[in-house]
Amino acid sequence: MIALNTLAILSVASLAFAADGGAGDGLVLFGAAIGMAIAAAGCGIGQGMGLKAACEGTARNPEAGGKIMVTLILGLAFVESLAIYALVVNLMLLFR
């Protein structure tokens, strides 16, 4: 998912950087929007799958709920960091 996001951003950005004047500004905006949409969709799907697995694990073994919750929170933080990295890359493209 990260590779697809990076490929989409870089393929559109290279055309925009090679253009003269303001001809590529629209392409940079389009690339940033597509890149953030892909990252947000991937993170949403990943977080949903993680929450589903945590709920199933807690339902099967309620005594392990505390350990599962700690692991879930850590995993959700890692997944959310990918969206933040995509946002930083998109902001770098927009305010170059």
From Swiss-Prot:
<keyword id="KW-0446">Lipid-binding</keyword>
<dbReference type="InterPro" id="IPR020537">
    <property type="entry name" value="ATP_synth_F0_csu_DDCD_BS"/>
</dbReference>
<dbReference type="GO" id="GO:0008289">
    <property type="term" value="F:lipid binding"/>
</dbReference>
<keyword id="KW-0066">ATP synthesis</keyword>
<keyword id="KW-0375">Hydrogen ion transport</keyword>
<dbReference type="InterPro" id="IPR035921">
    <property type="entry name" value="F/V-ATP_Csub_sf"/>
</dbReference>
<keyword id="KW-1003">Cell membrane</keyword>
<dbReference type="Pfam" id="PF00137">
    <property type="entry name" value="ATP-synt_C"/>
</dbReference>
<protein>
    <recommendedName>
        <fullName>ATP synthase subunit c</fullName>
    </recommendedName>
</protein>
<comment type="subunit">
    <text>F-type ATPases have 2 components, F(1) - the catalytic core - and F(0) - the membrane proton channel. F(1) has five subunits: alpha(3), beta(3), gamma(1), delta(1), epsilon(1). F(0) has three main subunits: a(1), b(2) and c(10-14). The alpha and beta chains form an alternating ring which encloses part of the gamma chain. F(1) is attached to F(0) by a central stalk formed by the gamma and epsilon chains, while a peripheral stalk is formed by the delta and b chains.</text>
</comment>
<comment type="function">
    <text>F(1)F(0) ATP synthase produces ATP from ADP in the presence of a proton or sodium gradient. F-type ATPases consist of two structural domains, F(1) containing the extramembraneous catalytic core and F(0) containing the membrane proton channel, linked together by a central stalk and a peripheral stalk. During catalysis, ATP synthesis in the catalytic domain of F(1) is coupled via a rotary mechanism of the central stalk subunits to proton translocation.</text>
</comment>
<dbReference type="GO" id="GO:0046933">
    <property type="term" value="F:proton-transporting ATP synthase activity, rotational mechanism"/>
</dbReference>
<dbReference type="InterPro" id="IPR005953">
    <property type="entry name" value="ATP_synth_csu_bac/chlpt"/>
</dbReference>
<dbReference type="GO" id="GO:0045259">
    <property type="term" value="C:proton-transporting ATP synthase complex"/>
</dbReference>
<dbReference type="InterPro" id="IPR002379">
    <property type="entry name" value="ATPase_proteolipid_c-like_dom"/>
</dbReference>
<comment type="function">
    <text>Key component of the F(0) channel; it plays a direct role in translocation across the membrane. A homomeric c-ring of between 10-14 subunits forms the central stalk rotor element with the F(1) delta and epsilon subunits.</text>
</comment>
<keyword id="KW-0138">CF(0)</keyword>
<dbReference type="InterPro" id="IPR000454">
    <property type="entry name" value="ATP_synth_F0_csu"/>
</dbReference>
<keyword id="KW-0812">Transmembrane</keyword>
<dbReference type="GO" id="GO:0033177">
    <property type="term" value="C:proton-transporting two-sector ATPase complex, proton-transporting domain"/>
</dbReference>
<feature type="transmembrane region" description="Helical">
    <location>
        <begin position="26"/>
        <end position="46"/>
    </location>
</feature>
<dbReference type="InterPro" id="IPR038662">
    <property type="entry name" value="ATP_synth_F0_csu_sf"/>
</dbReference>
<comment type="similarity">
    <text>Belongs to the ATPase C chain family.</text>
</comment>
<keyword id="KW-0472">Membrane</keyword>
<feature type="transmembrane region" description="Helical">
    <location>
        <begin position="68"/>
        <end position="88"/>
    </location>
</feature>
<dbReference type="GO" id="GO:0005886">
    <property type="term" value="C:plasma membrane"/>
</dbReference>
<keyword id="KW-1133">Transmembrane helix</keyword>
<keyword id="KW-0813">Transport</keyword>
<keyword id="KW-0997">Cell inner membrane</keyword>
<keyword id="KW-0406">Ion transport</keyword>
<feature type="site" description="Reversibly protonated during proton transport">
    <location>
        <position position="80"/>
    </location>
</feature>
